[in-house]
Regions:
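Glycine-/small-residue-rich active-site loops that bind phosphorylated ligands and cofactors
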Residues: 12, 35, 63
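Non-catalytic, surface beta->alpha helical segment in thiol-disulfide oxidoreductase systems
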Residues: 58-73
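Local sequence-structure signature of Cys/Sec-based thiol-disulfide redox active-site neighborhoods
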Residues: 1-29
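Structural micro-motif
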Residues: 47-57, 67
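Thioredoxin-like thiol-disulfide oxidoreductase module
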Residues: 32-50
């Protein structure tokens, strides 16, 4: 499984997503969509232009943007 989380620095919801996956022992790749324009472009391609982070993608499939209770992704 390849889980990717597109985030931005200082985002508390992004940190909640990281903490969730870390607590479950699920490995993920964390991309900075704010400061890396190429990653931001990728994120927009998955999310249909939605700028909401975290944006979660698993095995190339868009799972959702944002973080709530219950967690998305």
């Amino acid at each position: 499984m390849a889980l990717v989380i597109y985030t931005k620095p200082g985002c508390p919801y992004c940190q909640q997503a990281r903490d969730h996956y870390n607590s479950k022992g699920i490995p993920f790749i964390d991309y900075d969509a704010q400061n890396d324009s190429a990653r931001r472009k990728e994120m927009f391609a998955y999310s249909g232009g939605d700028p909401t982070v975290p944006c979660i993608v698993e095995d190339g499939k868009y799972l959702g943007s944002g973080w709530g209770n219950p967690p998305r992704g």
